[in-house]
């Protein structure tokens, strides 16, 4: 993957889901080998809604995640580390005993949980940039930091709160400079009243406006792939509207589509995106010594839709 990406002048960012162990319940859990840290240390694991998660409040678990990311950077010539939005899965996470042991400095469990995530982000920032100062480190949090009804700093929305329900304080990461970029998952349409795409774009623009943190916008292409005739997301119209809005916006370095497989399956989308990105500055190879044998002409011939999406598409994991 690294070689193939670099031969085509693309960056490759390793995608990490920091705490989630399973997504398919007991069958997946039973298939995990005994050598896994999850099986070696069952005291690190919390069951939540039939799935299993590492407990973010345990310092050894935080170190496990940091060490895992560092192992990737040490052994592979990746250009970045990208964390998904799954930290705490919900408010009723069974970590009261962990809070009693490690949370003495916090009067509220929510503040302690957010501090655990902040501590992980800061540790990753320091460790990864010590290994490679040019590495990009970022997170794609859920699109709503907090609703204005709960916090005056929040957005005019009525959706799931990353701050209160998933314990991700992405504003803290931006203000502390512990991420190089932020990529909020704005998987709603323009005009969707509970969580309007344009409203959230403006909120995130303001959030990064006084920082050095780059802003990329996550677009829910999977919604178009799953849409039926008559739906707002059906076809390419909604994606086109969102890209037009982003093209006219400041403080936005690009967009990330979830997912690449979805883009390929939407009727007319590959052709539209090829045209849309055709006038962008061509992708240039990273300033590294990638000793592939592919020629410039061969690279051009082998180019796919991904090569045209030069504005930082990292969603290759589906």
Show the residue positions of the predicted features.
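Conserved, mostly hydrophobic/aromatic
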Residues: 5, 65, 72, 84, ...
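The substrate-binding groove and active-site-proximal loops of carbohydrate-active enzymes
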Residues: 48-63, 106-117, 158-159, 185-191, ...
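Acidic carboxylate motifs that coordinate Ca2+ or other divalent cations, activating on Asp/Glu
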Residues: 291
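Substrate-binding cleft/loops of secretory-pathway carbohydrate-active enzymes
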Residues: 136-183, 188-200
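Aromatic- and acidic-residue-enriched segments that line the glycan-binding/catalytic groove
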Residues: 20-49, 86-105, 150-159, 231
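Active-site-adjacent "subsite" loops/lids of carbohydrate-active enzymes
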Residues: 13-71, 75, 164-168
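Aromatic-lined carbohydrate-recognition surfaces of secreted/lumenal glycan-active proteins
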Residues: 11-19, 82-83, 113-162, 214-222
């Amino acid at each position: 993957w690294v070689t193939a990406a670099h031969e085509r002048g693309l960056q490759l960012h390793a995608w990490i889901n920091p705490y989630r162990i399973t997504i398919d319940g007991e069958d997946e859990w039973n298939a995990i080998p005994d050598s896994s840290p999850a099986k070696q240390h069952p005291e690190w694991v919390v069951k939540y809604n039939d799935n299993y998660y590492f407990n973010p409040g345990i310092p050894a678990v935080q170190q496990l995640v940091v060490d895992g990311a560092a192992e990737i950077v040490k052994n592979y010539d990746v250009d970045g580390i990208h964390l998904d939005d799954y930290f705490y899965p919900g408010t009723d996470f069974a970590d009261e005993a962990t809070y009693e042991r490690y949370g003495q400095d916090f009067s509220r469990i929510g503040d302690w949980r957010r501090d655990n995530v902040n501590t992980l982000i800061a540790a990753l920032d320091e460790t990864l940039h010590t290994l490679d100062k040019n590495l990009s480190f970022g997170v794609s949090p859920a699109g709503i930091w907090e609703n204005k009804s709960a916090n005056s700093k929040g957005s005019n929305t009525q959706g799931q709160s990353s701050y209160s329900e998933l314990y991700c304080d992405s504003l803290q990461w931006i203000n502390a400079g512990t991420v190089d970029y932020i990529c909020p998952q704005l998987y709603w349409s323009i005009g969707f009243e509970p969580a309007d795409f344009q409203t959230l774009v403006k909120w995130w623009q303001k959030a990064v406006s006084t920082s050095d943190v780059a802003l990329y916008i996550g677009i829910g292409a999977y919604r178009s792939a799953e849409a039926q005739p008559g739906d707002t997301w059906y076809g390419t119209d909604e994606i086109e509207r969102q890209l037009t809005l982003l093209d006219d916006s400041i403080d936005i370095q690009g967009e990330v589509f979830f997912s690449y497989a979805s883009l390929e399956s939407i009727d007319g989308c590959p052709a539209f995106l090829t045209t849309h990105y055709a006038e962008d500055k061509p992708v240039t190879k990273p300033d590294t010594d990638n000793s592939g044998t592919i020629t410039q002409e061969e690279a051009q011939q082998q180019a796919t839709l991904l090569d045209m999406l030069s504005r930082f598409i990292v969603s290759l994991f589906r």
